[in-house]
Amino acid sequence: MRKIIFMAAAILFILTNTTFAARENVGVIIIGGAEFKTDDYYKIVKDELNPRSGAKILVGNDMQSRYQKYWLNRGYVGDQTPRRDDLISFTRMSGCGKVVCLVVNNSAVDSHNNAGRREKDRISVQIDAYICTPTAVADVFTASCDSNSKTSNLRARRGAFRKCLDTIAKSINRQI
């Protein structure tokens, strides 16, 4: 009987320790224009960010809504320019172990129209990525990339965003 009780206690102890060691979630928010807050861009983030820790990436309308609620609780309607303390405070409120804040600066559009040919769009995008924990802004990474498209500036913008995130992900995946 003692062996059974001891084995049950050991199994219970092992199971509770593994639940505490579960993977943490990493939230990702995009701070920038509305054109960057669509499913296409959320998919790019999920494709590019692959944490070595095995953490689950939370990105999309749910995380963006949490960010909006954060500002609403502070008395603002809509996005505000965050300070360092705001990023830390949002990370605490988000329920995630870490939050990656992707600040997308205004993209520059350069159009070339050759005689008799289609217009060619070139878009430049700069992304500042802040890795935030509940106690500090742990690190920052910056990338600026451009992309060309003969068909649409939306495609060029997506391509530039993907290139920037690919550059940032090479460094950021080790830390999240």
Question: Where are the predicted features?
Answer:
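Bacterial N-terminal signal peptides
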Residues: M7-T16
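N-terminal segment of the mature soluble domain
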Residues: E24, A34-C101, S171
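C-terminal/domain-edge helix-coil "capping" segments
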Residues: A21-G27, F36, D40-Y41, M93-S94, ...
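Charged, amphipathic alpha-helical segments
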Residues: C96-N114
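Short hydrophobic segments within beta-strands
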Residues: I29-I31
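Short, P/G- and charge-enriched loop/turn segments at secondary-structure junctions
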Residues: I88, N114-E119
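Positively charged n-region of N-terminal signal peptides that target proteins for export
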Residues: M1-I4
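Single-residue recognition of alpha-helix boundary sites
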Residues: F13-I14, N114, V137
